[in-house]
């Protein structure tokens, strides 16, 4: 056995780590004096330096130090390990010695750097992990033997931490001058987990005691030694064995008795610690002197004897110095930096520990036996492979056809099995994904029910709070009135008791239920997040299988089966999504029915109040203000026409239709709705669909489908991309006055709104369909025409005017009429509805025949009192004179359109309405009669010219309203459509008026 290896000089690496300042130091008033300037330089400030010493009479002790690497309090354990120790592992495996030790005063973080914590492991754990990882990477070519020993030097006595029962051990020196510990336990293992367990066991045996300077002060020096032996797996007469050793040392900190306040055993321990560290400092001083050949006394301490090779022998050494940045530890920090700076000058001679083993001739026989055993093992392996080949048919090896047959047989046996396995994996992934989606659907339903219950309880509590505040206000008002009637009002107001506001049991129960429901909501939300994550994982798994299967499939039948499997899964996913949407719409429908029910209850209550108050007024002949009487007429007209009842009935029909169908009818793109389609039900569903809602299920990914076997079907994309036009909401409970413009017809609304012309072009009705609708509702038209004829008959004289005067009714004249109204009128603003009326609603039909809720109402029956008619006639005459005078002053230059083509203004005022009929609110329409109007009877109603306000833009649509002629005989008038204007023919002139191009 021969020791050989080339040697080379290696400089000792010194790193500095500055720990964070502690809370105790801050409480003492300490300041930061250690500052890291860059990656290598650290400056130590003098805390006693006088800033007013301009002449520098006192010498400053401020000094900068330069090291190989410096760390401040922001450095992590990983950064320290990567910069100092990681590079030593490769050398240890190759046969070099290495040493890492932490140096510094007590309480500066040496043990934290070497051992660390469970969350931030130190150099010990990180080094052993990387060491065994490097061994595993090269274990195929090399054989390794790893042994570990762990000891501590306590009061200059060596104790085995892995086996404390051995007592105190002694140091010995072998024939080569290497220091050994007699009787130390060395544990050999290749398992990293076992090494970690031994390390944890040794750390628990180490001596630690609290002092005034450090609550977890290490009272001993801990030395962890790891020995690695490496040899080649190839047997030969010459064998190379590399032996490397790694020392990791956690030194105890130097301490002052005045700071630690030690007594008794602690003081004795501190004395031994300082003695060994002093010997280490002397060795460093002696080794750092370059020009002198001083004797280096390693025998002053057992610590220096163990570190003999590490400091001046065969080892790559890293010293990590630790200091405190506090000004109270200035002297200790300066001494540590001084010794660390001197240690930089130490150079070691590093050589590889390589053992060349030459075997004796007598050992050749064992080597030959090992080689013969290896040959026999290889022969047996060859025979086994040949036997399997002969058992498959003893085919002729030279015939290419037999070889091809064998290959096909082999692939045929493996192909179906592999294909079946992949198919089973795909099906299982689909089933799991569907189960997760169904569970998500159930969770969504539960969350919806919890939300409904929570809203109900919150309404109960809110109602009680409102009632309580109302009672308190009423009680205070009564007490105030009572106090005014008494002489000692202040005394009475102070001695009153508050009303008893005990919560009802249902309110207390609601509060308790809300707390439980909130907890249930949180639980459901967590489960939903977990299921969504699981669903994403399953979709990714299924996508990977879909990518893999096409490459494994060879036949068209298998491809077809795979596509059918994917199709079935997609249909199941679509079914689940539709069920989710149906649940959401059922919930919305329940909310809507509840709101309608409450509105009906409120309306019935208001009707009772109005009738009762009206009865009191009639019984006692009370004087009623004019605007209140007009509002009452509006109320009577609503009751007579039954618009609210019709709206309620239509809502019930739509709700019943939605209840009967579990899923909405999705209209494909490009389809035209029939007149018989239930537009109201479609309106409800589409309006709910347009609201932003949370996804009930994770959406199918929109990834690229170029590699998928089965892509999304056209029907699936059609369902996803189709949009159902939204009909207008039915107007319920709104007051319509005389000054309100007429309702737009279906055709005018479609052509007057840019949005409706783009989105609702599919629902235009043909002439035949409109005629059929008008025929079915003939009775309604007859009734409307009769009322209109009576109104025109009473004021027919105003419709015939001199032909020489050319003026028409404009919105300006309407605004002038508004100016003539008396003050005190009720303002009622109502935004226009940009959507369509129902195709068969009575409001729309009455609008098309020239009679609607916005028209003048003739004399009512017995509902109106006779005592207000004289006032109305007087008001009508004054109004007529005012309008006639203003009409002569202004000449209308408006664009001639029919009255039914008017768009609704954005705002209008609810003012007093006279009762004479149409002539009271319209000026005489003079001029040439329109050729599109038929004359029925003696009185003819020419088309009125209407001027649009500047802020009312009818868009680029084509207004083609229904033209209606007055009917004196009470016969239902026939609706005809006027000539259609070209698209975009309406423009604004320079004067701000809409003109025809």
From Swiss-Prot:
GO terms for biological process: axonemal microtubule depolymerization; microtubule-based movement; plus-end specific microtubule depolymerization. Signal peptide: none annotated. Its main location: cytoplasm. Disruption phenotype: Mice show growth retardation, higher mortality (4 weeks after birth) and display hydrocephalus as well as female infertility. Female infertility is probably caused by fallopian tube obstruction. Phenotypes are due to abnormally elongated cilia that cannot generate proper fluid flow. Keywords: ATP-binding, Cell projection, Cilium, Coiled coil, Cytoplasm, Cytoskeleton, Microtubule, Motor protein, Nucleotide-binding. One of its GO terms (cellular component) is microtubule. Residues 750-759 have a biased composition (Low complexity). Residues 477-494 have a biased composition (Basic and acidic residues). One of its GO terms (molecular function) is ATP binding. ATP binds at residues 104-111. Residues 683-697, 835-851, 950-959 have a biased composition (Polar residues). It is found in: Cytoplasm, Cytoskeleton; Cell projection, Cilium. PANTHER family: CENTROMERE PROTEIN E, KINESIN-LIKE PROTEIN KIF19. Plus end-directed microtubule-dependent motor protein that regulates the length of motile cilia by mediating depolymerization of microtubules at ciliary tips. Belongs to the TRAFAC class myosin-kinesin ATPase superfamily. Kinesin family. This is Kinesin-like protein KIF19. The lineage of its organism: Eukaryota, Metazoa, Chordata, Craniata, Vertebrata. The gene is Kif19.
